[in-house]
């Protein structure tokens, strides 16, 4: 029991969120570099003479130099075992991104110093606040021209509604970037650029009152630093660890992921402030991560991960106890016992066998087609289900048809398989079949991913016609859709589970439906 507690206390599980090109994949790689998990960082854009980014593995990602799927990466650092849930950073991200946040205990928000808070960051932040998880901010690309740091922090507070407290403070930016001032230690870490960021950065640390500092920092920047230190101490938000852990205050660090600058200080601050895995709720009860009985839930399913492994894998977030390879568990939704013989951990498309894992870890389990998003597995006499993972509303819709009617079986199998993974949502007319399918996605790129995968994995080509719908609402079970008074451009459909939904072309249609149908309850997401 003591060993179990020690192992769980070492665990940290966090997701990295950002807008495209803020440097999220680069930051992820630098964490792995410092943890010794990789010897050389890749490059995000996959240049000819360099490796592809370690966390980007799907063929379409390598072609485009973007993260489309969510990766799960683990590394050890100074006695901690850290699980990074890497979310897609491209503008056209997917529902997978949201679900990954359901498996994390906290989030690292990466912001481009020249751009500030952007659209995708806002969307992902909403999910973090819904779960009240701690959010740590890394303001990246300080070695390029950046906006005023006060302005950036004010924008985070106003746009996202969370207070900020800088843990360190930048000295200049762009070509004049001289380093950061560590507020707690009252020290300056000098910026020494590393070409390409392929090795750990050299560091030189000076006390803030060291006369030598003036040799490295321009007079104007030196004077400004003294003013900033005084201003932050007098007028800045007071640091509160309690507020950080409650998701009400975001500690802010500045740096440059590409040149490795500020990565290690950020990691140290992060580990000092975070907690081991937190309890989860199941059937109204709190499940303690330290309990001996094992429990976990599926937050992601991925099929045909590459040509070498044509298979399907369910990713489980372990919530309590210890996993052991070959253990027998109870699958709550399937109402039966199963053996977990094939379990993996992943570094991009490299797989390694997992013999044991603990609360806070993520494991991939071979799935013969029995698991769905949100499923629970447990050991012990008491069976329970963790709270369902929300199905988030798609924002783009298209009608798809199979080009070759002789391949109907492959078409249906492929579309259903990809939908079960949660990459897309599929809808059909009430009482209709699978001849014509409406596909809903959170990001438009998922249409491209769907076409690519159907062609390469199922040998099926499709016709795709965009649809004008912008809003989707689930209808409370038991509602008779046929009797509803709706605008002429509203469409009645059902999802894969047969749940009734309405598709609207604009928010006026949503308001019309609510005004004309007393007591009609419309839901923005459904529970799995």
For the regions a language model picked out, list residue spans one by one.
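Structural and coupling elements of P-loop NTPases
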Residues: 1-528
């Amino acid at each position: 029991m003591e060993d179990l507690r020690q192992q769980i206390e070492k665990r940290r599980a966090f997701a990295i969120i950002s807008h495209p090109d803020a440097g999220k994949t680069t930051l992820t790689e630098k964490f792995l570099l410092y943890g010794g998990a990789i010897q050389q960082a890749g490059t995000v854009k996959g240049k000819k003479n360099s490796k592809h980014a370690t966390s980007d593995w799907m063929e379409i990602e390598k072609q485009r130099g973007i993260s489309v799927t969510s990766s799960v990466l683990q590394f050890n650092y100074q006695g901690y075992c850290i699980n990074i849930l890497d979310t897609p950073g491209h503008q056209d991200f997917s529902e997978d991104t949201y679900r990954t946040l359901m498996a994390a205990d906290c989030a690292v928000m990466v912001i481009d110093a020249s751009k500030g808070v952007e659209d995708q960051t806002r969307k992902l932040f909403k999910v973090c606040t819904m779960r009240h998880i701690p959010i740590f901010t890394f303001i990246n690309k300080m070695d390029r021209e950046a906006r005023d740091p006060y302005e950036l922090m004010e924008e985070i507070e106003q746009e996202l509604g969370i207070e900020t407290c800088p843990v360190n403070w930048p000295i200049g930016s762009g070509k004049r970037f001289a380093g950061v001032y560590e507020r707690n230690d009252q020290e300056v870490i000098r910026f020494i650029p590393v070409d390409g960021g392929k090795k750990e950065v050299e560091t030189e640390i000076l006390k803030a009152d060291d006369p030598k500092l003036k040799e490295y920092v321009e007079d104007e920047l030196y004077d400004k630093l003294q003013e900033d230190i005084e201003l932050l101490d007098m007028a800045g938000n007071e640091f509160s660890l309690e507020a950080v852990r409650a998701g009400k205050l975001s500690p802010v660090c500045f740096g440059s992921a590409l040149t490795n600058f500020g990565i290690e200080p950020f990691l140290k601050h992060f580990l000092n402030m975070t907690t081991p895995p937190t309890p989860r709720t199941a059937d109204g009860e709190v499940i303690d991560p330290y309990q001996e009985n094992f429990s976990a839930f599926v937050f992601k399913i991925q099929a045909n991960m590459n040509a070498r492994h044509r298979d399907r894998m369910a990713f489980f977030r372990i919530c309590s106890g210890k996993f052991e390879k070959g253990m027998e568990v109870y699958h709550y939704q399937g109402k039966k016992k199963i053996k977990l013989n094939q379990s993996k951990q992943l570094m991009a498309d490299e797989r390694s066998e997992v013999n044991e894992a603990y609360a806070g870890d993520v494991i991939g389990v071979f799935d013969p087609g029995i698991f769905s998003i949100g499923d629970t597995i447990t050991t012990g006499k008491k069976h329970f289900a963790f709270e369902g993972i929300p199905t988030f509303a798609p924002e783009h819709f298209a009608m798809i048809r199979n080009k070759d009617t002789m391949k109907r079986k492959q078409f249906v199998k492929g579309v259903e398989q990809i939908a079960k993974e949660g990459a897309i949502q599929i809808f059909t007319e009430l009482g209709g079949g699978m001849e014509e399918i409406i596909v809903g996605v959170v990001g438009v790129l998922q249409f491209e991913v769907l076409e690519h995968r159907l062609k390469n994995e199922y040998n099926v080509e499709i016709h795709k016609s965009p649809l004008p719908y912008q809003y989707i609402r689930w209808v409370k079970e038991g509602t008779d859709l046929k009797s509803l008074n709706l605008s002429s451009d509203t469409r009645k459909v059902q999802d894969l589970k047969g749940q009734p939904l309405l598709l609207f072309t604009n928010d006026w249609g949503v308001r019309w439906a609510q005004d004309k149908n007393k007591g009609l309850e419309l839901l923005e997401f459904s529970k799995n």
